[in-house]
């Protein structure tokens, strides 16, 4: 997939990986490749309008990827999305792919998120998948930058801040299309069992 000039990306770095013994999720290696390198590698190939990783200074970001962080840190994924969108500074009509760094199966969803084009009344498209029951994956989606900016500003106006606010609570108000993906595509990494599952698939 050639990079599209109308597509940008935000990679949300995730928390401290408490259930993984405090490991830095972006630096977790699967198949000899760090998660941040694997995920950003997919996005850089598709997103010509820029890619930003919301990660602390301790994480080395791949070449061609910007870095930002919510202030203060550890504000949760919605605060990370807000920081990432501000760092990108893209026009309202740009499409912004939003993903978590612990999504090594991302390559299986990006084409379905970007094609076909969004409908005229749609504000974005998210993946639906999971095990045992599929559910909306707001951290595996593409959003119109203007709609994302508006809904975040509305949340700040209503709540005072998006720090610690759930992603689903805010983004579900958008007019979103949904595309089904295999459960494996959106399996994230929260536990040692998840790490072992991905290592069996990709190697250590």
Name each region found by the language model:
Residues 2-164, 169-185, 193, 203:
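Nucleotide and nucleotide-moiety/phosphate-recognizing core
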Residues 197-200:
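Short, charged, intrinsically disordered terminal tails
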């Amino acid at each position: 997939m050639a990079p599209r000039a109308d597509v940008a990306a935000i990679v949300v770095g995730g928390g401290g990986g408490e259930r993984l013994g405090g490991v830095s999720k972006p630096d977790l290696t699967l198949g000899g490749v760090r998660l941040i390198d694997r995920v950003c590698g997919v996005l850089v190939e598709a997103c010509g309008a820029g890619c930003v990783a919301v990660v602390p200074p301790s994480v080395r970001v791949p070449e061609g990827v910007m870095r930002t962080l919510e202030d203060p840190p550890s504000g949760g994924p919605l605060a990370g999305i807000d920081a990432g969108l501000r760092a990108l500074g893209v026009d309202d009509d740009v499409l912004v792919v939003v993903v978590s760094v612990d999504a090594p199966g991302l390559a299986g969803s990006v084409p379905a998120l970007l094609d076909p084009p969004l409908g005229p009344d749609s504000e974005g498209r998210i993946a639906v998948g999971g095990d045992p029951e599929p559910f909306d994956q707001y951290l595996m989606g593409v959003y119109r930058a203007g709609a994302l900016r508006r809904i975040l500003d509305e949340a700040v106006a209503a709540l005072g801040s998006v720090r610690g606010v759930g992603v689903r609570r805010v983004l579900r108000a958008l007019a979103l299309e949904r595309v089904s993906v295999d459960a494996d595509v959106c399996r994230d990494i929260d536990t040692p069992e998840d790490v072992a599952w991905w290592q069996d698939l990709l190697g250590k």
